[in-house]
């Protein structure tokens, strides 16, 4: 159930592609990965998705956040649909305590979010 390599090359796994650095990338919902692998609990979710973090977080159903204990993510204010304040607000509303790690006024940084389960 931990074989995520199958998502690398499958065509049409999801009907959305994103043009990035002169190549198309196949995208899928995190919900689909959780469902297909029958994941009941995720202790640690690391997200480094180069500006897609807002789309990904907004696509996760509310009840699926209950499965995720900790999220560590890189954010990109200049390209994501959600800036770091909006991400922290979203995660706080889902029951997470968030810590922001950002150098000065940089457009990117890290968010550490955890919840008691």
Where are these regions (language model features)?
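Conserved acidic-Pro-Pro-aromatic motif
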Residues: 25, 29-117
């Amino acid at each position: 159930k931990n074989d995520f390599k199958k998502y690398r090359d499958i065509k049409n796994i999801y009907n959305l592609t994103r043009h990035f650095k002169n190549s198309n990338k196949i995208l899928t919902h995190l919900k689909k990965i959780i469902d297909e692998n029958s994941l009941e609990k995720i202790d640690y979710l690391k997200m480094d998705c180069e500006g897609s973090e807002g789309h990904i977080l907004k696509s996760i159903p509310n009840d699926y956040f209950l499965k995720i204990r900790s999220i560590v993510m890189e954010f990109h204010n200049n390209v994501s649909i959600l800036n770091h304040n909006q991400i922290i607000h979203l995660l706080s509303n889902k029951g997470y305590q968030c810590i922001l790690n950002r150098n000065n006024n940089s457009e990117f940084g890290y968010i550490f979010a955890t919840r008691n389960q």
